[in-house]
A protein has these predicted regions:
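C-terminal structural segments of small proteins and small subunits
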Residues: 69-95
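Short S/T/G/P-rich N-terminal loop/turn motif that feeds into the first structured element of a domain
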Residues: 1-59, 63, 67-74, 101-105
Length: 105
C-alpha cells in the first residue's frame, strides 16, 4: 500500500509572529500523534527563499505522511483533528491542501 502525503498551506488573516506561533503550537498539540503517521512536521515560510518559482502566499505549512490512505481517512474524522479545525479556522484567510500518493525508490 502506498504512503500518502498530506501537505497543508495556511494563510492567516493576521500573520503576526504570535498568531503564526499559535498555529504552529496548535498543529503540534492536535495533529502530531495520530495512528498511522510516519512523518510529521510543521513550519513557517522562509522569506529569504524568494526565487521566481517560490510561492510566498502562506504563513504556515503542515507536512504529514501517513502509512496508507486508510490512516489518512481516519485522521480526517478524529476528534482532535476536528477540534483543531474548529479552534483554528477563524484565523485562516486561505487553506490549500495537497494530497499525494508516494512511491518508494
Amino acid at each position: 500500500m502506498a504512503q500518502l502525503s498530506h501537505i497543508v498551506y495556511f494563510t492567516l488573516h493576521d500573520p503576526s509572529p504570535q498568531k503564526v506561533a499559535d498555529l504552529v503550537s496548535a498543529c503540534h498539540r492536535y495533529l502530531s500523534h495520530h495512528d498511522g503517521v510516519v512523518y510529521f512536521s510543521v513550519g513557517t515560510l522562509n522569506r529569504e527563499l524568494a526565487r521566481p518559482v517560490n510561492d510566498l502566499n502562506y504563513d504556515v505549512s503542515l507536512h504529514i505522511v501517513f502509512d496508507c490512505k486508510d490512516s489518512h481517512d481516519r485522521y480526517q474524522v478524529e476528534p482532535s483533528h476536528l477540534r483543531f479545525i474548529e479552534e483554528q479556522k477563524p484565523a485562516w484567510k486561505q487553506v490549500r491542501v495537497f494530497d499525494s500518493d508516494l512511491t518508494q525508490a
